Design a protein with these regions (language model features):
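Glycine-rich, basic loop-to-helix element that forms the pyrophosphate-binding segment
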Residues: 69-86
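Acidic donor-binding segment of Leloir-type glycosyltransferases
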Residues: 25-68
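Short, well-formed alpha-helical segments that are part of the catalytic scaffolds
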Residues: 13-26
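Cell-envelope/extracellular polymer assembly enzymes that use nucleotide-activated donors
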Residues: 3-5, 23, 33, 171
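The conserved acidic donor/metal-binding loop of glycosyltransferases
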Residues: 95-99
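Conserved nucleotide-sugar donor-binding catalytic segment
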Residues: 137-195
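Conserved donor NDP-sugar-binding/catalytic core segment of glycosyltransferases
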Residues: 105-131
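Short aromatic/hydrophobic "clamp" motif used to bind/position activated sugar donors
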Residues: 91
Length: 195
């Protein structure tokens, strides 16, 4: 069975990190793993990791790593590290401030046949919005978020995120679909929330 690996950079945000991990633990399909990469040491990281492991909530689904940092590059160094060490068939490079609907993994894995890039719609919440806003994802600049798509691991590992660019999401997508055309599937459902 195919699995999705969530690559989750984090730094100094244990409450948000708990939210994304619980959203994964509540997936209706168990065929996923997560790799949490701390972008440098922070005061509560070790305690958070120990407490989470002690609770034994994840049954070997969640791995923790610490890299030298903070790199202050929107998590791109940590995502590149996670990508280099990915072990599952599919990867989702996300952020610790996000969370997923319970059927995200199920919907994505139903659509893997003959596809190598799968993406869904999302809800977006930023400080300047007064409310959550639905965004129908499109393969154009400013209309797709790193966390709403999954790619075949072996293809994604041939690319890297631009550490200096705020638009690394789109730059990655543009390179990916240019190098690996075809096999693109849009799931016209909201399965992801960017907080």
């Amino acid at each position: 069975l195919e699995k999705i690996e969530f690559i989750i950079p984090c730094y100094n945000n244990k409450y948000q990190l708990k939210n994304i991990l619980y959203s994964l633990l509540n997936q209706s399909n168990p065929n996923w793993t997560a790799h949490v990469i701390s972008d440098g040491e922070w005061v509560e990281y070790d305690d958070f990791k120990i407490d989470f492991e002690r609770e034994n909530l994840f049954e070997d689904k969640i791995k923790f790593s610490l890299i030298k940092g903070p790199n202050k590059d929107w998590g791109h160094t940590a995502r590149n590290y996670g990508l280099e060490h990915a072990t599952q068939d599919w990867v989702v490079m996300t952020g610790s401030d996000n969370y997923y609907m319970p059927d995200f993994v199920s919907e994505f894995l139903k659509n893997t046949t003959n596809n190598n890039f799968i993406f869904c719609n999302m809800v977006h919440n930023e400080a300047h919005y007064k409310h959550y806003q639905e965004l129908k994802a499109e393969l154009t600049v400013n209309n797709i978020d790193m966390s709403c798509f999954a790619t075949k691991k072996e293809n994604a590992q041939q690319l890297r995120l631009n550490k200096k660019s705020y638009q690394a999401d789109w730059e990655f997508v543009e390179k990916y679909i240019t190098l690996f055309p075809g096999g693109i599937k849009h799931i016209n459902k909201i399965l992801y929330v960017h907080n």
